[in-house]
Amino acid sequence: MMRIALFLITNLAVMLVFGLVLSLTGIQSSSVQGLMIMAGLFGFGGAFVSLLMSKWMALRSVGGEVIEQPRNETERWLVETVRSQSQQAGIAMPQVAIYHAPDINAFATGARRDASLVAVSTGLLQNMSRDEAEAVIAHEISHIANGDMVTMTLVQGIVNTFVIFISRLIAQVVSGFLSGNRDEGESSNGNPMVYFAVATVLELVFGILASIITMWFSRYREFHADAGSAKLVGREKMIAALQRLKTSYEPQEEGSMMAFCINGKSKSFSELFMSHPPLDKRIEALRSGEYLK
């Protein structure tokens, strides 16, 4: 809760300072305050709705099944491993789910540390040793213990807010200038068609650029989740799990859930837009102990 309050206060303070600067430079119009509020509502609103619905959406997207009562030895081992590690990490027991996929993969999601979900693929259970699987589960438990889902939502909310606000502010200035709007009584947005066209293009461009920030933060949290796993089950187990992942198939999970999947192979696309660091970098970070301090 303190983390949420701090992020909201920081975001509000920056927006107020930005509004003051606009006022002093004469750029501010009567609608800027309303634009700031609208950007904040839409920017944070979408991010928090996604967070609150994350467990339901994640299970639905992969066809996951929550284990209510273990039906076999593998499910019993999985539930007991999650229970033991969550106790070690000081969090409430997450829901445990399995989904059918050939990929060696797992993910964690949930709106709160004490109301979370850990899901693993059948491919992981079939193709990893118990030690390797323990390390992967510990990685997901570390995401939960670190509060990464909430933190990523707050970061995404701030980024969304500024993308919406700056895009529409620039669109307002451009459309007003092109329409020759100089009278107080006229719409501050100038030509509506120009306004929405410019705002749409800028939101797309700024959104792509802003994703560099969110993906950088996601990669940073992955290193810490790897370190958390090493602390829970041992460095060598986590290294072995990452080495195993180097030979696995690419994961198919998309969107916000992808940020908390264990797999993260380097793709041909720029590393700037990757949610996970390359596996070799993660292994090297564990060996050097960079994030274990």
From Swiss-Prot:
GO terms for biological process: proteolysis. It holds the Pfam family Peptidase_M48. Keywords: Cell inner membrane, Cell membrane, Hydrolase, Membrane, Metal-binding, Metalloprotease, Protease, Stress response, Transmembrane, Transmembrane helix, Zinc. Binds 1 zinc ion per subunit. GO terms for molecular function: metalloendopeptidase activity; zinc ion binding. One of its GO terms (cellular component) is plasma membrane. The active site is at E140. It is a multi-pass membrane protein. InterPro entries: HtpX_protease (IPR050083), Pept_M48_protease_HtpX (IPR022919), Peptidase_M48 (IPR001915). Zn(2+) binds at H139, H143, E222. Its EC number is 3.4.24.-. Its cofactor is Zn(2+). The chain crosses the membrane at residues 4-24, 34-54, 158-178, 193-213. It is found in: Cell inner membrane. HAMAP family: Pept_M48_protease_HtpX. Belongs to the peptidase M48B family. NCBIfam families: PRK05457.1 (NF003965). This is Protease HtpX. It comes from Pectobacterium atrosepticum (strain SCRI 1043 / ATCC BAA-672) (Erwinia carotovora subsp. atroseptica).
